[in-house]
Structures are given as structure tokens and as C-alpha cells.
């Protein structure tokens, strides 16, 4: 055992002495003052991490240089310096510049609307100019004129007689009639349409139509365009009210008597007394009335007059049987 201890001491004594001379290896880490900023956003944290990595790389490079110069320090001696990175003013100014540029790129809505309105107005003016520059009159009736065949004297197309034309290509077999007549017309319906249009244009009188419209259900049209009454004037309204009142009174009054008869005073028939039935005077010759033939005797009936034989003179002497036959 002693020999083994001696051998170990002989072999490893030099290394232990060198370790004691050199001392324990210490890792030196330098920390700068850290100030915590909890309000930083995620973008600043990423930038801090990048800066930490760059600082560690730079410090590792400087440490390796010192170790190579001294030769006494090993690769384990690493100096790490952590710096407190704060957002600089340049970054804030950069953000403000970006905001200003973005604001400068934005346009004023009023200016944009005004520019669009001006362009729209310009467009409408150009359209109006184009419409005004057109020489085609849509209300005019075209005239027939064909210079190639030497036909046509400028007559209206509605008054043109088709039979006078030399060429009638629409009558050829297999020809499409729509190539010569529009809107579904053919030769016969076109002629009927032309005659109808000429008749309507001849009978049409705008002034007469307006008079009929202005008359309405009333009478003749006055000078002011109404039925003899100026509705805009107060006197005209009063006259109209008086006419309505007169019409109502006429409807309420009883009918007038015929010509030559006097109208009884009002309330005459209502206040007129009627005579009593018992006080009527007796009629003359009522008591001496004769008894008629085949008449049953009635109670309280007076006797017939003297000399009456029961027969009436002609033409009142008709037998009773003849009256029944008739």
C-alpha cells in the first residue's frame, strides 16, 4: 500500500502543485445596472434579445483575444456584459416620420368629392354638348328620296304610294320582309298605318284638345281659364257660394202651380176647417126618387115617383140580359 501511495504522489504531485499555484478557476461575469421597464412592447423585447446576442458575440471575441495574448486563461473564462437597452429617440422620430408620411398620403375627402363632382359635371356638360350637336330631328317625318335609281321627289314616307315604285324587292320569293319593313310591318299593314297617321295628324288640334280639357264637366271656359268664375278672386268665391245656396233653396221649395192659378197663402190648406158630416143639407128630389126595376127593396128607401112604370126611356131601356152578354 505504501508503494502505491508513493507512486501516486510521484505521478500526480506536480499537477497538484500547479493547481495550487494557479488557484481555482473563477468565471467572471460582469453585470451592468438593470432597470426594469414593464411597459415595453413585444417589438422592443425582440430588439433587446438581438442586442444581447450581438454583445455576447463581441465579448466572446475580445475574451479569446486576451486568452491568446496571456496564454494563462482557458476557454472557460467568458466575460458577459448585459446592457440596459432603452428605445432611443431616433426610433420614436422614425415612427413619427412614418405617421407624417402616412398622413401626407391621405387625401382630404372634401377635396376628393369636389374633384369627383367637377369631373361628373364636366362629363354631363360633354354629354349635353353631344346631344345639342345632333342634327337629327326625331319628331320630323322622313322623306323618300333615292338618287341611285333616279326615283323620289322628296315626298313624305307616310304619303308614298308603293305601287308607283319600279322595284319591289320585298315581293320576291324567299325574301325576308323584315329587311325592308321594321317593327313587324308588311306592305299592307304599313299602308294602313300610314293612312291612320295622316288622318290623326289632320284631325289633331292641340288648341281644341286644351279647350276640352279646361272645360271639364262644367260649361264654357272663361277668359281666365275657368268656368266663368275666377277662383283666385274673393268675389268669384262669393258668387259660387250664392249659386249653391240658390240651388239648395229651389230643391226644398214645393212645385209651382200652373199658369193662371193663384198660389194659396201659406198654411191655408192646413188651417181650413172641414164641415161635419151630420150637418150636410139634403139634396133636392132625393125623397121622390122612383124605385128601380129588379132593385131589391132597401130599408128606409123612399117610394118611386108617380107615373114610373119601371122602364127607362131610350137609350137607357137596355134589357138586363143584353148587358150580361156584352
From Swiss-Prot:
Residues 1-138, 215-267, 302-326 are annotated as: Disordered. It holds the Pfam family Fip1. Residues 1-18, 70-79 have a biased composition (Acidic residues). GO terms for cellular component: mRNA cleavage and polyadenylation specificity factor complex. Residues 85-98, 127-138 have a biased composition (Polar residues). Residues 50-69, 112-126, 236-253 have a biased composition (Low complexity). Residues 30-49 have a biased composition (Basic and acidic residues). GO terms for biological process: mRNA processing; response to xenobiotic stimulus. InterPro entries: Fip1_dom, Pre-mRNA_3'-end_processing_reg. Residues 254-267 have a biased composition (Pro residues). The keyword Nucleus applies. Keywords: mRNA processing, Nucleus. It is found in: Nucleus. The keyword Nucleus applies. Pre-mRNA polyadenylation factor that directly interacts with poly(A) polymerase. Belongs to the FIP1 family. This is Pre-mRNA polyadenylation factor FIP1. It comes from Candida albicans (strain SC5314 / ATCC MYA-2876) (Yeast). The lineage of its organism: Eukaryota, Fungi, Dikarya, Ascomycota, Saccharomycotina.
Amino acid at each position: 500500500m505504501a508503494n502505491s501511495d508513493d507512486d501516486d504522489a510521484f505521478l500526480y504531485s506536480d499537477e497538484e502543485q500547479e493547481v495550487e499555484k494557479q488557484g481555482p478557476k473563477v468565471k467572471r461575469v460582469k453585470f451592468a445596472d438593470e432597470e426594469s421597464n414593464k411597459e415595453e412592447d413585444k417589438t422592443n423585447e425582440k430588439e433587446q434579445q438581438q442586442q444581447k446576442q450581438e454583445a455576447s458575440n463581441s465579448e466572446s471575441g475580445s475574451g479569446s483575444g486576451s486568452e491568446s495574448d496571456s496564454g494563462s486563461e482557458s476557454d472557460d473564462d467568458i466575460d458577459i456584459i448585459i446592457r440596459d437597452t432603452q428605445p432611443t429617440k431616433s426610433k420614436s422620430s422614425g415612427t413619427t416620420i412614418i405617421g407624417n408620411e402616412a398622413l401626407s398620403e391621405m387625401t382630404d375627402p372634401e377635396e376628393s368629392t369636389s374633384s369627383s363632382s367637377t369631373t361628373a359635371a364636366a362629363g354631363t356638360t360633354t354629354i349635353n354638348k353631344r346631344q345639342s350637336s345632333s342634327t337629327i330631328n326625331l319628331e320630323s317625318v322622313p322623306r323618300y328620296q333615292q338618287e341611285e335609281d333616279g326615283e323620289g321627289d322628296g315626298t313624305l314616307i307616310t304619303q308614298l304610294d308603293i305601287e308607283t315604285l319600279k322595284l319591289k324587292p320585298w315581293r320576291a320569293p324567299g325574301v325576308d320582309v323584315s329587311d325592308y319593313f321594321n317593327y313587324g310591318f308588311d306592305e299592307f299593314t304599313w299602308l294602313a298605318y300610314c293612312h291612320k297617321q295622316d288622318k290623326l295628324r289632320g284631325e289633331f288640334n292641340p288648341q281644341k284638345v286644351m279647350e276640352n280639357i279646361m272645360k271639364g264637366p262644367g260649361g264654357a271656359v272663361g277668359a281666365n281659364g275657368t268656368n266663368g268664375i275666377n277662383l283666385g278672386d274673393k268675389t268669384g268665391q262669393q258668387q259660387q257660394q250664392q249659386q249653391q245656396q240658390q240651388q239648395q233653396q229651389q230643391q226644398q221649395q214645393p212645385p209651382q202651380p200652373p199658369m193662371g192659378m193663384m198660389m194659396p197663402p201659406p198654411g191655408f190648406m192646413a188651417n181650413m176647417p172641414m164641415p161635419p158630416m151630420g150637418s150636410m143639407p139634403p139634396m133636392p128630389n132625393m125623397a121622390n126618387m122612383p124605385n128601380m126595376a129588379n132593385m131589391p127593396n132597401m130599408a128606409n128607401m123612399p117610394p118611386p115617383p108617380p107615373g114610373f112604370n119601371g122602364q127607362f126611356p131610350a137609350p137607357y131601356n137596355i134589357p138586363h140580359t143584353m148587358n150580361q152578354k156584352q
